[in-house]
Amino acid sequence: MIDWSLCPAVERHPEKVGGSWVFRNTRVPVVALFENLESGASIDEFLEWFPGVNREQVEAVLRYTIESLGTDRSAA
């Protein structure tokens, strides 16, 4: 499981979206990015559909995910 607390592009507040991790200063859950990518959407489409999220945030989340998965792999 990824510890999102160190990713600067996201935040979590109990009063926002039930405490889910969201893109900073939005109510867009981080999981929405991965669900849309899994369904075949492009990053540009995601950004169009969720205008509160910017490209830098998406890139930061993807980089953080890759780094976290690399850390998990080296710990195994």
Regions found by a protein language model. Give the residues of each.
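Acidic, low-complexity/disordered tracts enriched in E/D and polar residues
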Residues: 1-28, 34, 70-76
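Long, charge-rich, low-complexity alpha-helical segments
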Residues: 26-76
